[in-house]
Amino acid sequence: MSQTDLSRELYQSLWNAADILRGQMEANEYKSYLLGLIFYKYLSDNILQAVCDNLDETFESFQQAQLLYEENFADTDVREDLIEVLNDELGYVIEPSLTFTKLVQSIHEGTFQLESLAQSFRDIEQANEKFENLFEDIDLYAKKLGNTPQKQNKTISEVMKQLNDLNVSGHAGDILGDAYEYLIGQFASDSGKKAGEFYTPQAVSHLMTQIVFAGREHQKGMSVYDPTMGSGSLLLNAKRYSKEASTISYYGQELITSTFNLARMNMMLHGVAIENYHLSNHDTLDEDWPTTEPTDFDGVLMNPPYSLKWSADSGFLQDPRFSSYGVLAPKSKADFAFLLHGFYHLKHNGVMAIVLPHGVLFRGAAEQKIRQHLLEEGAIDTVIGLPANIFYNTSIPTTIIILKKNRTNKDVFFIDASKEFEKGKNQNNMTEDHIAKILETYQKRENIEKFAHLASFEEIVENDYNLNIPRYVDTFEEEPVVPLTDLADQLAEIDKEIGEVEARLAHMRSQLVGTTPEAQAELTAYLEKLKEI
């Protein structure tokens, strides 16, 4: 089976498991259950694979590996060494009685208890600080799973049985990670506006990541940072565009705990080593992070919540992230606060890509002062206008702003990619061809009529530091000149058609007859009234 067929089969199987929960709760709610159980199976299957490897036994099936694990765990001479090896290798241990395979076996035997699954979750969370509170969003006793303990048990049992046939550990790395991303994308589509908190469409992620990684594909030890990471999809795209993916260090921050947990699972399912990712569950603007080395990064990738309210407390004027600008982003729109936070954590030779609404390009007052400061120091390298309606949480057009610290000039390159899309059922989509066109234009940095323009700093000053894309890229299409004689002919033809329609309508009205004297009188009065109009 080809990798494409394998991925397609895996995607479909995972989505079928979601059908069991779909009728009982919103996608935004059931994603935690399904993704959490997939992750638990992944950890559990890895244990059984590792048991076979460390006991020099060929892995044949999870049932065979389960029996091997039970036998050796029961042997007191082997147990402690086996636990130590598993902890060293995987960073956690799941006892034989609590593996996914064992619990599914108990489901078929009619002895399964939700408490066994809850205990397994607790054991995993306590095994390693990176697993702490990982499953806290999964309430196994929630009423939405069923009104009685028996119904709750049955719902979870059905999902586990559906997932049981999947060899998720066999798909570890990008195949399983991509399947997980597929599910997250499907949840985002189902969730609508609620999805914006955790997902950036893949096309946008690919475009931003390729820009940040341009010329760095072979760099070892690359560090990437996303202070509003959501599910981590934007960060994880770094793996696709690096020839040294195993050496990348990932840093991310997320305020919403359920989304933070999603990102942690996503990292592991993509095969990222525990020591290579560093994630924080805090408020990015209120609590600067990281504050200990390393604090700056080769690449910064961001898709923050748009025009979010924040405190804008005057104390932030002393915060090193914002102090050199003399003003703060307005309380009603934190867009520039997020941008300055990311820029502060960018290395001198790094590249930053951030998605924001178009308002940041032209709004006045404090935002204009911040924008002017950034332009005067040459920080804004490129502005890319994206198509409208490509995000799940908003239909407004957005822009990617590329920032750098080591530029020797202050010009700004503008790309109007607002028409680079194909229409989808609910959203517009950017294809690989659209992305390739934008990337090629970005790299060449040359003027293209109605698509791209390299604006000098003097030109920007003349525009009062307003970066609104239409000021620099003229996409106006003139209407073709139509001779007046042609217009007269068209009007005459239209008048003729109107006359024909009115004649047909008058004929149809003349055929109307009332079924009673009263109805006939009313109809006659109606027709007389029409003649007066």
Regions found by a protein language model. Name each.
Residues K41-V51, F187, R216, S242, ...:
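A generic secondary-structure signal for well-formed alpha-helical elements
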Residues M1-V212, H278-T284, G385-A388, K410-S418, ...:
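Non-catalytic, mostly N-terminal accessory regions of nucleic-acid modification and defense proteins
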Residues V168, E217-H218, H345:
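Surface-exposed acidic, glycine-flexible loop patches that form ligand/cofactor-binding
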Residues Q3-D5, E287, T292-I533:
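A conserved structural/catalytic subdomain of Rossmann-like adenosyl-cofactor enzymes
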Residues K194-M302, S307-F316, R321-Y325, F336-A337, ...:
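Conserved S-adenosyl-L-methionine
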